[in-house]
Structure formats: C-alpha cells, structure tokens
Amino acid sequence: MNSQVHRKGSIAEAVSAIQAHDKIVIFHHIRPDGDCLGAQHGLARLIQTNFPHKQVFCVGDPKHNFPWLEMVFTPKEQITPELMQQALAVIVDANYKERIECRDLLDQNQFKAVLRIDHHPNEDDLNTTHNFVDASYIAAAEQVVDLAVQAKWKLSPPAATALYLGIYTDSNRFLYSNTSWRTLYLGSMLYRAQANIAKIHDELNHTSLKDIQFKQYVFKNFQTFQNVIYFVADKKFQKKLKVTPLECARVNILANIEQFHIWLFFIEEGKNHYRVEFRSNGINVREVALKYGGGGHIQASGAVLKSKRDIIRVVQDCQKQIAV
C-alpha cells in the first residue's frame, strides 16, 4: 500500500463520531454501484447489531440494483429538521454534494455532525466535522470492514454480505492492481462472518440474453485510436437495445485487450451530455478526467462532457497520457 496516498481523518475518528450519536443517517452517491450501496447498508447493519438502541436511516434510491440484497430505505420525507439537528450524517464513497443522492437534505445544513467515509483522493464540499478518507483502500466497503474489525464490532452475516458486495465489485473481483493483502485479509473476515458469498457470485456472474446482445454490439462497434479502445453508447444505441444510461455503465467489457492500455465508455445521458468511464491497466487516467472536470482513482475515473466533440479530444488526451 502506497504511504503517499491521500488521507484525512482516521478510523478512530469515525468510530468516535458513530458512538457519540444515537441517530445516524447514511447517504450513497448517484448512479449507485455495489460499493456505495454495500458500504451504506453494511455500515447500517453493523450499527444496528452493535448498538441496538441507535436509530439508523439509509436514504437514497438503488435504481433497481441488487434487489436480492434486501436493502431497506427510509423515505427522505421522514428525515425532519428536528431529526437532523440530533443526527450524524454519514456519506460513504462520495465527496461532492452534486454526486450524492438526496443531497437536498445535506443542503439544509441542519445535521449535528457530518462524517465522510471515502476512498477517493479528492477534497469535498460536505462541511464535514469528521473524516475517514484514505485512498489506499480499494473500496469504501473495505474501510467499513476495517473499522468494524479494529473497533471489535460484531460482523453479522447480513452486514458481511453487503460489505463483501462492495469490495468484490469495486476491486473488479479482486483483479485490480490496488487489491492488497489488507483487502484479502478483510475479505477473509467476511467469509468468517458467514457472508453469503455464493449468492453474490451467482447473482453477479450469470449472463442473460440481453447481456450477450449488449456485448455483441459493443464488440462489433468499438473504436480504437492507437493504444486506446472505446465505445460510444449514444441514444440510438440505447433505444435499439432498450437499455438505460445507467445500464450502459459497463466499461470493463473492453478491459485488458492486448495493446490497448486505456479503455473508455462514453454514455449519452442527454443532449450534449456524455458521461465518460475511464479505465486502464496502470496508466494514470485520473489526470485526464480532472482536465474535463471529473476525478476518481489512477486506474478508474469518470467525467461528464458537455459536447460530443469532446469525445475525440478525450481519446487523444488518453493516448498522450500513455506516452507520458
């Protein structure tokens, strides 16, 4: 693990904040993935098991992802100003309000305290009072497991299952290079806690006819520029395959193809609005994402483009980054 990575706050600071509040509201980011939902609900289940007197509320919308995880959400209308004034807000796996589901609750600035648990090497606009930010972790869910282990909290099977989902998905099945000994050790703690590993593997690795058709279209229509391979999921494609922009977020279909060091998905979300997913096998794509107002990790980042003309510029900038 790189000792020079971005860090802010600590496990002890996060544990202290959680222990000090009897009402806790946990947020996830927009375009939810396995890590933000797994960290959110894993943390909620941990708190409910170890501090049964505390009230824990998960707010947001999973967008039909992982229905088998049996997530329970509280309607945001139930998070009243009176509740917020007594509560700790916990934001997992995110740093800016524009990236957070139910951000309007945070905009009111009514929470008694705000804790950020995140593995992204970015600053934030959350007005946090407490932090556990550490970019050496592969997933926010890994941070939550480490927190639980170091605090000697009991890991229930439902909590362990949610947290394993977060680590498994954000590490791309433990294939990403920043998977560490700690990742595997904490993963083993989830096995020991009887996480439903088989269920997660079965659910995430089965293939439908729609999946095959999606991949077939991508493989027939991808584009290349020197050592960069990419696909544009425009509205025409989405209509043809009857998929939503969120369902198009599958950049790793083009992963690790010989000679292509960076792979990209450009997903049209609206007029002159393209979301870019950057991935690489070692090249720093975060630098390119930052140039276009995005961010993320060295090998996995994202950004939003305001013009279709920027697509080729991004591709060219990625090729330049390979040459650095």
From Swiss-Prot:
It comes from the Bacteria. Keywords: Exonuclease, Hydrolase, Nuclease. It holds the Pfam family DHHA1. Monomer or homodimer. Bifunctional enzyme which has both oligoribonuclease and pAp-phosphatase activities. Degrades RNA and DNA oligonucleotides with a length of 5 nucleotides and shorter, with a preference for longer oligomers. Also degrades 11- and 24-mers, but less efficiently. Directionality is controversial; shown to degrade 5-mers and less in a 3' to 5' direction, and 11-mers in a 5' to 3' direction. Converts 3'(2')-phosphoadenosine 5'-phosphate (PAP) to AMP. In accordance with its dual activities, is able to complement both orn and cysQ mutants in E.coli. Belongs to the NrnA oligoribonuclease family. This is Bifunctional oligoribonuclease and PAP phosphatase NrnA. It comes from Mycoplasma pneumoniae (strain ATCC 29342 / M129 / Subtype 1) (Mycoplasmoides pneumoniae).
